[in-house]
Amino acid sequence: PIEGEELEYCVNDVLGLVEAIQALMERDGDTLQTIPLTSTGYVRRNAKRAMREGIHHNFVYSILPDFETYKALREAFRGGNTHANRYYAGDIVENVHSADRSSSYPAVMCNCEFPMTEFVPILPKDLNKDYIARCITIRHKALLLRIGIKDLKLRDSFWGCPYLSKDKCRNIHKAIDTEDNGRILEAEYLETTVTDIDLKIIMEEYTGQIIFLQGWYSSYKKLPEPLINEVVKYYKDKTELKGVKGQEIFYDKAKALLNSLYGMMAQDPVKHSLIFRQFGDWDEDDTPDEELLGKSNKRAFLAYQWGVWVTAHSRDA
C-alpha cells in the first residue's frame, strides 16, 4: 500500500488539479458536463462560436463533400513537402543558408482562397487540357482531379526535391523512385489525385502527357471572416510570448493551440471507433465509411476540403 510522503504527494496532486479545474470552470462558466476535455477543446469551442457569427450551419453543410468527393480529397491530401536533396543527403555541407516561413498554415488560412462552394463533377466531355486551363485561369475555380501521366520525367535531372511521392500515386508502371527515397524521378505511367495547386507544381517540375480521368470544381473565396479573426487572435497570443524570457512553456502551448485550428480542418471525418472488450480484447467498429461520413457531416462546422487546401497552398509557397 501507498503510505506516508508518497500518499501525501498523490493526494495533493489530485487536490491541485481539482483547484485548477474549478478555477477554469469559474472563469468560463463551465460545469463538469460542459468543460472541454483537452486544451484544444477550448479552441474547437471558440472556433464553433466564431463560425456561428453570421455563418449559418446550412452553409457549411451545403459545401461538405459527398462520399466520392471525400475519397478523392483523401487521396489528394498530403502534408508539407519535406525532403532531403539526394545529391547532398548524408553529407556535411558548410556555408549554407536557410529560410523559415513563420506560422505557414495559419498564414495561408488568413491570406489564401479556398473551395467555398459545393464540388461539382466535371463532365467527361470537358476533361481536357483546354477546359481545365480555363477553369484555373479564367473561371477562378478550385479543382480536384484524378489524373494519369504518361512518359513522366523531371525537367531538371538535378532538381533535389521531386514533387511526386510514390506513396500518393497508384497504377505505377516502370517508375524510378528508389534513387530518391520514394520520390518519383520518372515513370512510364502513373495515376494520382491532385488539387489545381498540385497540378501547377507538377507541370513546372515534370514533362509528360497528362490525362484527366475524373474531376470536380468549386469556386475560390476567402475563408469566413469570423474564422480568420479567430486565427489572427491565436496568432497574436503566440507572437506576444515569442522570445519572452520565462514564457517558453506558455509560448509552446500558444503555438500548439494556433496550429490546432488547422488540425480541426484536416481531421479525417471518417473515423472507426475501437470497442474494447474484457481481458484486453478489442474490435473495430464496422460501420460503413459512407454512413460515418454522413454522421460527421451533420455536426461539422468546418469543411474537410479546407484542410486539404491549407497544406497545398503551403507547399506552393
Where are these predicted regions, by residue range?
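Conserved acidic
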Residues: 1-317
